Amino acid sequence: MFLLQKYDYFFVFLLIISFFSILIFSLSKWIAPINKGPEKFTSYESGIEPMGEACIQFQIRYYMFALVFVIFDVETVFLYPWAMSFYNFGISSFIEALIFILILIIGLVYAWRKGALEWS
C-alpha cells in the first residue's frame, strides 16, 4: 500500500504522456491529407531518379557481422557501468562479470569456428 503511494506521480505522468501520444497520432492521422499515387511507391535518392530496383537483397554475411557487432556493443553497454563502480561491489561482482565475458567469448569462438566471420 505504502509502496504504491511513492509512485503515484510516476503513474499520473505515464497516463498523461500516453494520452497526449495517442491524441497527437490520432490528430495527425485525421488532419493529414491522403495522397495516393505512383510517386509514393518510389524510393527517394537525393532528388535523382532511382537507378535499378529499390528493394535489393543483402547477403547473409552482412547480417552476421551486424549481429556480432550488436552483441559486443551490448557487452560494452553492460561492462562500462560495472567498471565505473567496480570498487563498490566486491569480488562477487567481479566473478559475475568474468562469467558474462566468458559467455560472450564462447559465442565469438563459436561464430568464428562456424565461419560466420569469414568474408569469402
From Swiss-Prot:
User: In the Enzyme Commission scheme, what number(s) does this protein have?
Assistant: 7.1.1.-
Q: Name one Pfam family in it.
A: Oxidored_q4
Q: Where in the cell is it found?
A: Plastid, Chloroplast thylakoid membrane
Q: How does it sit in the membrane?
A: Multi-pass membrane protein
Q: Which InterPro entries does its entry note? A: NAD(P)H_OxRDtase_bac/plastid (IPR023043), NADH_UbQ/plastoQ_OxRdtase_su3 (IPR000440), NDAH_ubi_oxred_su3_sf (IPR038430)
> What is the role of the protein in this entry?
NDH shuttles electrons from NAD(P)H:plastoquinone, via FMN and iron-sulfur (Fe-S) centers, to quinones in the photosynthetic chain and possibly in a chloroplast respiratory chain. The immediate electron acceptor for the enzyme in this species is believed to be plastoquinone. Couples the redox reaction to proton translocation, and thus conserves the redox energy in a proton gradient.
Instruction: Report quaternary structure and partners.
Output: NDH is composed of at least 16 different subunits, 5 of which are encoded in the nucleus.
Name assigned to this protein: NAD(P)H-quinone oxidoreductase subunit 3, chloroplastic
Source species taxonomy? Eukaryota, Viridiplantae, Streptophyta, Embryophyta, Marchantiophyta
Q: Which gene does this sequence derive from?
A: ndhC
